């Protein structure tokens, strides 16, 4: 008696959990309430909130590095002589890019790359960093 073996591909479908949304939608009232709450919390922590305008320059890089830390998304490096060096400090916490709250490090990088000639960063800066 001969044995016949059949081989054919088997596809295994695994259910992936849904990805978290990359954007959130808030009404203007919800956004205002959220913003007021965040600013109050930051003041208690000893931080000021600043709106920083960076003008992109074709001859110079923005020159900043960002990273995830326990306090959020922070400026981790600033290249001397860069556009960022004029207004940002290592330790600044990024709250929003071009008016949009940031969710993670990827959203900061994506928003910075997608911005036009002007880049607006809402940051929280600890009082001890001010000069």
From Swiss-Prot:
Disulfide bonds: none annotated. Residues 51-127 form the PDZ domain. SMART domains: PDZ. Pfam families: PDZ (PF00595). This is PDZ domain-containing protein C52A11.3. It comes from Caenorhabditis elegans. The lineage of its organism: Eukaryota, Metazoa, Ecdysozoa, Nematoda, Chromadorea.
């Amino acid at each position: 008696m001969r044995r016949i073996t059949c081989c054919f591909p088997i596809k295994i479908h695994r259910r992936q959990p849904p990805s978290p949304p990359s954007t959130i939608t808030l009404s203007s009232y919800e956004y205002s309430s959220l913003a007021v709450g965040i600013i109050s919390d930051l003041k208690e922590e000893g931080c000021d909130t600043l709106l920083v305008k960076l003008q992109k320059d074709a001859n110079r890089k923005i020159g900043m590095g960002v990273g995830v830390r326990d306090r959020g998304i922070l400026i981790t490096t600033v290249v001397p002589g860069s556009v960022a060096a004029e207004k940002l400090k290592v330790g600044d916490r990024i709250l929003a890019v071009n008016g949009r709250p940031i969710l993670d490090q990827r959203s900061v990088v994506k928003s910075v790359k997608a911005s036009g000639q002007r880049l607006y960063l809402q940051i929280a800066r600890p009082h001890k960093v001010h000069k």
